Amino acid sequence: PELSQHTAADVAATFSGLLQQHGITVEAEPAAHAAPQGANPIASVSSATLSEILAFMLRHSDNTLAEEFGRLTALARSENNSPEGATKAVRTVLGNLKIDINGLTMADCSGLSPGSQLTVRTLAAVQQRNLTVGDGAPAAEGLSVAGLVGSARKRYTSDDVAGLLRVKTGSLDT
């Protein structure tokens, strides 16, 4: 299905059509209106915050969410909502933060596409910023914790290190 840009109107039109298919007369066209004063909601939607979703993405190495965050970055930077727009936007943001991106090659935002490369220097600079700048805390806190949680839960499980290391899991190609 195509992504709706006007979900309330689309739902109302679909509902109206279904009512008519079942012999119920609908006398007016769906239209947007403010709820009457004192009206009680009939439904609501809630979600985790973007910070919580980011932490989940990092902790569980969720590649689909990584791509989504790339696309959100692209849209926020007025780039195309595409893999190319996402990687361009991420590189621009990193550059604006004065993070060394020499040697960074992004074929996508998840790292799944062939050709993506990340230097230790770039990764360390991103994590350093996350640990020292207030708005980076969710990214730092979202990393897997060795021996405890996330994709590193079954790694480094000895008492000497379990719970002490926040790590980004994945594979490195040398």
Task: Please give the residue ranges for each predicted region.
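Short, highly charged low-complexity linear segments
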Residues: R129, G150-R153
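A small/polar active-site loop signature that marks catalytic segments
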Residues: P1-A137
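A generic short-segment signal for beta-strand/edge and adjacent turn/coil regions
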Residues: A35-P36, V93, G147-S151, D159-L164
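Active/binding-pocket-proximal capping segment
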Residues: G136-G150
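Short clusters of hydrophobic/aromatic residues that line enzyme substrate/ligand-binding pockets
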Residues: M106, L143, L165
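Short, Gly/Ser/Thr-enriched beta-strand-loop segments that form substrate-interacting elements
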Residues: N40-S46, K154-T174
